[in-house]
Amino acid sequence: MATSLCEPPPRLAARRPSAPPLSPRSKSLLLPRGARGGDLRPPAVSPLFLGRTALRRLKFEARASGSSSGGGRRQVRAMASLGGLLGGIFKGSDTGESTRQQCAGTVSVINRLEAEMSALSDSGLRDRTSVLRQRAQQGESLDSLLPEAFAVVREASKRVLGLRPFDVQLIGGMVLHKGEIAEMRTGEGKTLVAILPAYLNALSGKGVHVVTVNDYLARRDCEWVGQVPRFLGLKSIEELVLRGFNYCVIDEVDSILIDEARTPLIISGSAEKPSDRYYKAAKIAAALERDIHYTVDEKQKTVLLTEQGYEDAEEILEVKDLYDPREQWALYVLNAIKAKELFLRDVNYIIRGKEVLIVDEFTGRVMQGRRWSDGLHQAVEAKEGMPIQNETITLASISYQNFFLQFPKLCGMTGTAATESAEFESIYKLKVTIVPTNKPMIRKDESDVVFRATTGKWQAVVVEISRMHKTGCPVLVGTTSVEQSDSLSEQLQEVGIPHEVLNAKPENVEREAEIVAQSGRFGAVTIATNMAGRGTDIILGGNAEFMARLKLREMLMPRVVKPVEGVFVSVKKAPPKKTWKVNEDIFPCKLSSGNTQLAEEAVQLAMKTWGQRSLIELEAEERLSYACEKGPAQDEVIVKLRSAFLEIAKEFKVFTEEERNKVVQAGGLHVVGTERHESRRIDNQLRGRSGRQGDPGSSRFFLSLEDNIFRIFGGDRIQGLMRAFRVEDLPIESKMLTKALDEAQRKVENYFFDIRKQLFEYDEVLNSQRDRVYAERRRALESDDLQSLIIEYAELTMDDILEANVGPDAPAESWDLEKLIAKLQQYCYLLNGLTPDLLRSKGSSYEELQGYLRLRGREAYMQKREIVEKQAPGLMTEAEKFLILSNIDRLWKEHLQALKFVQQAVGLRGYAQRDPLIEYKLEGYNLFLDMMAQIRRNVIYSIYQFQPVLVKKDEDRNGTPGKPTTNGRSSGKPDPVSVESSSPAASPQASA
């Protein structure tokens, strides 16, 4: 937090000194030149300039100053327009035919170019990239290049992947290029669509980001469609890890821009060592009873101690007040109760080894490297008896909304966007366009089955699975937690139904690709959390090519992958033993001896050429991936592996095609939902695993009035229905019930929309501040000459001191020049020649005195710079850069903490009929002014006081007072408290 003008900065170290205060009267500080006033504003994605480094996991980085304002910044409306709202209501009936008609002309042009592209050699096709890039850089618009670029990508895809993009996929690419959201149904090939506009926009040389929702999809898509841009010569091995913000394609855009947008992106650093209080608080929470000692609001995710809870907790802890700032027990106790009641094992987190790992509620996946903040993660660790890791502090924070709004051109694709079109248009200015399907969708979505109690619901789910299993129809069961999936698995084991479980547990995550590959087989039953909800392509009859790859992988990897060296493994746990062994039941048949021999020969050649156990796993996976695709290959090992792969896939395909026909006759994939999600979109994502590309399929949801969504958000109507229906194992059919359930789900959607909107509005306050700070930091980081910036700091600091100690409105006769000189010399001992008479002679008015002090501030800086540079050339520049960056980083971190406290506090002001958001803006702005002033004061003060050992003697010869040094830094920094108490003449506070 920025320090006040009447107190010394906290914990100032000699090697990183902070400026002393100016005056107790100074409340309004000047912003650095160029800063603007006015309003200032809670995974897996990496940038992809379409090359080998295309792991698409989101890495947060501050934006450069050049893109922080101006035309690239989208103006945002807080609420949806009526047109956007009506669009969201009526768009569901749009089949995309209007979009087909609008794009028909361009599609025809691309189709006419197909014969020309097919006639080109591989090198000739690659050369088209150079030609197109040159035309783009010469000023030709990307719109005019689109037909030829799309034709090039279509031909490359045919050669490399064996897939020819359909006309509707070309239309999807055009929608994305226009900066809109393309709603495309499941199985329509969204991943391949993304390559079309990504290639086109990469021709400008400004880079493209492709974003997806998790590591599994990022890795899969990079290995698969990433071959197309690599084949066409778009590589970025030596490029920056994160390119500038130019064009971004977001896969599953509704998940990232809406579902994930309730939580900000936070970069945190390690703070203090954990306290033993977490363990003690966990024991207290275990002893306290719900509704007696505390109440729980599951909707708001908050807990509140009752009067008895306060008294009993204080008695156990032997303290007088839980909120005593010297002890701060309240935070520990409340977090411990939250961990007990609201954060449940195998629902919100899992235990792996001695770690508590968060499970993403939207994807069902473990969020590696993520931790809850504000001591909550430590409270969960204490509850589970795990070692408590260090507390964290926020170093940087940005909302998803503001992060993605940095892109001048943003687009996305998903199967479920129309219901949220109003929010997309109001926040992101993104229009939702329905793309027509390649084949009609014939999936049958059956009506929901509702029970009073969860016991009846789960019994009915088991009966449904058993019924469909007997017909041979593959079944995908969607659950909302690890706990539910394990419980259902136990029930299916009891009735003897073979099945697979896909959830966040490590043993299941490692088999994810294997499980998904066989989920569409005849009679298969798969229980999955939301991990199988997005991006999962379930092929009826099984995926023969993927099974062939798994067979080749289990033979190759153990022989060519280097074993994990002990030096790279954490001392806390042994390296995991990896065998790549696959359950034989996944394969549709036993591999013939001929193909087994062919694969063995290929593996032996790989060992001989690459070396036995000599490759890191990632490199071996990449080589195998390339061998299993259709791109041009001249390497002998790749050719041999590909030959084995194709023969194995051919053998498997005979059986999977036969099985596919049986599955189609049985009715296709049947999806069973076990709980309504917070949004209809997520329900539709689960349903969308069935009925891809015109395949048959069906879906049905089994619900209970005790489900979380209805229990927490259902209100009095659901409670009344629960009392009215007393039979637990009979389904309830009622129009009133259906209406009540729909209303509860709408309540949830509106509730979470309000959360996202509030987060966005509060982050908007921070956004302008973030832009200004990052611009200042980037300016210091990239500049080789910081003289002009330091001079600016010096002049503004002189202005601040003058205003704080004299004031622009005070008559010259009342100026306390002794006090002013004392403060100036406290900042800079090089100003030791100042006297009251000198100041009076140089400035009869406030403006003249201000000009003279600015001149002396510049001269003092240049004098210090000359002395240091004379003895150590280049040292002053390095010192200036270090001091600016370190002060910005430290004070910005403290500023974020201060703003968090303000945001928590302003909510109470609503009771006084004051708008919390306006209060937050005002206080946040004042805190920001204080911080920016403190940065420049600290920097210029540190530079004035900077005294390396080697220049000390030279300064003494120049008549400046000698100062003791410590480790090359001055330890003579004046302490305002001690100086003022011992020397009234030098004490602004004492004289005040």
Tell me what each language-model feature is.
Residues 27-28, 35-39:
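Q-rich, low-complexity intrinsically disordered regions
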Residues 349-357, 363-369, 631, 664, ...:
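Extended, charged helical/alpha-beta scaffold domains that provide interaction surfaces
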Residues 37-41, 54, 69, 182, ...:
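Polar low-complexity intrinsically disordered regions enriched in Ser/Thr and small residues
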Residues 33-37, 50, 65, 69-71, ...:
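Feature targets compositionally biased, intrinsically disordered low-complexity regions
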Residues 8, 37-40, 58-62, 955, ...:
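Acidic/serine- and proline-rich intrinsically disordered regions
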